[in-house]
Amino acid sequence: HKRWLAFYTGLVLLFAGLACMGGAALWWLWPASACLLLAAAYAGLGAQALQKQADGRHSAAVAVWLLPYFIVVRLNMAYWLRGVPQSVAVAENVHVGSILAAAEFAAVVDVCAEYPLFRRPEHYAAVPMLDMVPPECADLIRAVRLLEQMRRAGRPVLVCCALGYGRSAAVVLLSVPVGALPSK
């Protein structure tokens, strides 16, 4: 957490410094305050600081507050996911991938705290976890149980985070027996 706390604190200072120029530069206070909220999340408030709701969206206040950050996150996802599938099947009815692939599924377990889900599928559960830090065991267990519940209903389930490489993969690896994973 310390590295991300330092990173977002550094951005707060940078953007606040730019805002000191006054005039139109005062707009830099918006991304500065967004980074301040992110720093607070990594300082100990956790994923709940980002206020992702049960419908996959953030509270209205946080959605406006974090808009500059959402734009950067979306650009980052586009960069890292260029030329690769947004989701892949890893076991029967279990897919892992980016939150951007959620619109293709009727069942989604969303572990992405930092980016909203714009179109909620019929069967949806959010277990928001912070990016780039070890997930809490209780959150992983909750996400695995939700995945199993949706999977038992016989529908394909997407477990997603921002890119589909970390948090979502951890949930899937905890839920799928090793023998059920593809060999390649």
Give residue spans per PLM region.
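N-terminal membrane-anchoring alpha-helices
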Residues: 1-80
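Secondary-structure junction/capping motif
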Residues: 59-62, 168, 183
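Generic low-polarity alpha-helical segments
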Residues: 68, 173-176
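A phosphate-binding catalytic loop at a beta-strand-loop-alpha-helix junction
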Residues: 154-173
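Short, electropositive, low-hydrophobicity segments enriched in small/polar residues
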Residues: 48-50, 101, 168-170
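Cysteine-based protein phosphatase catalytic domain of the PTP/DSP
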Residues: 74-159, 177-184
